[in-house]
UniProtKB/Swiss-Prot annotation:
Probably deamidates glutamine residues to glutamate on methyl-accepting chemotaxis receptors (MCPs), playing an important role in chemotaxis. GO terms for molecular function: protein-glutamine glutaminase activity. Belongs to the CheD family. Transmembrane segments: none annotated. It comes from the Bacteria. This is Probable chemoreceptor glutamine deamidase CheD. It comes from Pseudomonas syringae pv. syringae (strain B728a). Its EC number is 3.5.1.44. SUPFAM superfamilies: CNF1/YfiH-like putative cysteine hydrolases. It catalyses: L-glutaminyl-[protein] + H2O = L-glutamyl-[protein] + NH4(+). GO terms for biological process: chemotaxis.
Amino acid sequence: MNTPVGVAEIVLGPGEVVFQTRPTRLRTLLGSCVAITFWHPWRRIGGMCHFMLPGRIRRHQPLDGRYADEAMEILIRHALANGTLPEEYQVKLFGGGEMFPAHRHDPHMRNVADSNVHAALALAEQNRLKLMAQDLGSTGHRSIIFDLWDGNVWVRHQPMEAMEKDAKQKNQRTAGR
């Protein structure tokens, strides 16, 4: 990860959408949320969103990056505003980790992670985007780093099983003191 000198770094929170036209490193942390990265390989511009839910009923309200369809619309508008077409971008999808796997089959619990994954895949298809990579589903959280100067996306996935195992080992070490 050779970082250009003086590169900006932006951390996205849930519901945020960022689009940059200069070398920038974008970061986010995902659980059941999904991140979509947009990168234009010739212009080396792009952005990322961190959406929380597939959609909402919107009546005369401004676009809101918390919702998949609206976050995608924001990214597409940025692409067009920069004289590029959405189809020219390399798109990657990340996240949608089940954070409560014990409740997976509970009929009273809505599976937000699965809904987000389906929404992201459907939006990529509907908008005829070049889906280059995806790391979706499973359990746990992901840390995402997206470098706009070269289009690389770095993912660290921590499945729930690994977190539970780490917690048990820590408890065993602590109990021995």
